Curated annotation (Swiss-Prot):
Similarity comment text for this entry: Belongs to the elongation factor P family.
Name of the protein in its database record: Elongation factor P
Organism of provenance: Lachnospira eligens (strain ATCC 27750 / DSM 3376 / VPI C15-48 / C15-B4) (Eubacterium eligens)
Signal peptide span: none
Pathway(s) annotated for this protein in UniProt: Protein biosynthesis; polypeptide chain elongation
Length: 185
């Protein structure tokens, strides 16, 4: 059990016959009236987002989420195949289940599959990945004073913005949470 006053980003709760993840929360103490917690919740199955206000003492059951290490094997049409590296069990997920969470993940890399009661609802890629730039325009030295970027396509097909000094064939590090360039590899 957790009360609304103890909300943290990322926790999952059971609310209104569903499993919801707290995306954002804010403690509000108005000048008049009692304090409340304003929270933005995301349904982990449907992906729907709601905003709601709760009394800080309102109690919720925590939902148990399994995060298991799996190896991303390959894509076969609209199915993406993963293997549990401990049990060697394989699982195939549809493109709808995967979404764009694999846009920075190469085949044979490790990911975490998040599930509730056996139903996979999210894929957590590694926080930082190294990828090769397959396509980008050449950067012209002296074009700018600071911080200029250009579009680049990496080996997984994802498009990101990189600094001008990055060239085709360079290996770069990308933060998968934001999709931003972090450094050269």
């Amino acid at each position: 059990m957790v009360d609304a006053g103890s909300f943290k980003n990322g926790i999952t709760i059971q609310y209104e016959n569903g499993i919801w993840q707290v995306i954002e929360f804010q403690h509000v103490k108005p000048g008049k009236g009692s304090p409340f917690v304003r929270a933005k919740l995301k349904n982990i199955i449907s992906g729907g987002v709601i905003e709601n206000s709760f009394r800080p003492t309102e109690k919720f059951d925590l939902a148990h989420i399994d995060r298991s290490e799996y190896q991303y094997l390959y894509a076969d049409g609209d199915l993406y195949n993963f293997m549990n590296t401990e049990t060697y069990d394989q699982i195939a997920l549809s493109a709808d289940q995967v979404g764009d969470s694999l846009k920075f993940v190469k085949e044979n890399e490790m990911v975490k599959l998040c599930s509730h009661e056996g139903n996979v609802f999210a894929i957590e890629p590694p926080i930082s990945v190294e990828l090769e730039v397959t396509e980008t325009e050449p950067g012209i030295k002296g074009n700018t004073a600071t911080g200029a970027t250009k579009p680049a396509i990496v080996e997984t097909g994802a498009k990101i913005m990189v600094p001008l000094f990055v060239n085709q064939g360079d290996k770069i590090k990308i933060d998968t949470r934001t999709g931003e360039y972090t450094s050269r590899a």
